[in-house]
Every structure is written in C-alpha cells, then in structure tokens.
C-alpha cells in the first residue's frame, strides 16, 4: 500500500469517518482532530512508517490537512 493510502487509513480510523474527499480540509478548524487525537496520529505514523515525529516539534500548520500529513510523512521517510 502506498503512503497516501496508509495515511488516509490511519486518519479514517482516528477520526472515525472517511476523509478521502476532504484532502485539503483543515482538521483542527473542522473539529475532526484535537490534541489527544493529534498525539495518537503522530504515534501511529511513527509506528507505521518508522519515522520520528516528536510532539515537541509538531507545527500544526504543517499537519492540518490530509495532504499536508502525507507530504510530511513522505519527507520524513526520505
């Protein structure tokens, strides 16, 4: 499975709905993610992709849409 599909699957699980048609929607403005679910997202991404995404370095503006999460994960994978 490609990074995009795996990230969308993780997001769908955490958010509890299919977000595949909301790829540029802001999670935080829409209320789909809060601080607890953000930590869960980062931990799931670290585990799935063997990357480091420390909460202490989290910049909400870089992770606020599905497309941005995918781009960030791809950049961390190298």
UniProtKB/Swiss-Prot annotation:
Keywords: Cell wall biogenesis/degradation, Cytoplasm, Phosphopantetheine, Phosphoprotein. One of its GO terms (molecular function) is D-alanyl carrier activity. The keyword Ribonucleoprotein does not apply. It comes from the Bacteria. 4'-phosphopantetheine is transferred from CoA to a specific serine of apo-DCP. The keyword Kinase does not apply. Residues 1-77 form the Carrier domain. It holds the Pfam family PP-binding. It is found in: Cytoplasm. Carrier protein involved in the D-alanylation of lipoteichoic acid (LTA). The loading of thioester-linked D-alanine onto DltC is catalyzed by D-alanine--D-alanyl carrier protein ligase DltA. The DltC-carried D-alanyl group is further transferred to cell membrane phosphatidylglycerol (PG) by forming an ester bond, probably catalyzed by DltD. D-alanylation of LTA plays an important role in modulating the properties of the cell wall in Gram-positive bacteria, influencing the net charge of the cell wall. This is D-alanyl carrier protein. The gene is dltC.
């Amino acid at each position: 499975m490609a990074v995009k599909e795996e990230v969308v699957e993780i997001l769908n699980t955490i958010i509890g709905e299919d977000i595949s048609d909301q790829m540029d929607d802001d999670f935080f403005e829409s209320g789909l993610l809060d601080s607890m679910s953000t930590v869960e997202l980062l931990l799931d991404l670290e585990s799935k992709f063997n990357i480091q995404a420390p909460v202490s370095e989290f910049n909400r503006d870089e992770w606020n849409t599905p497309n941005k999460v995918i781009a960030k994960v791809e950049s961390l994978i190298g």
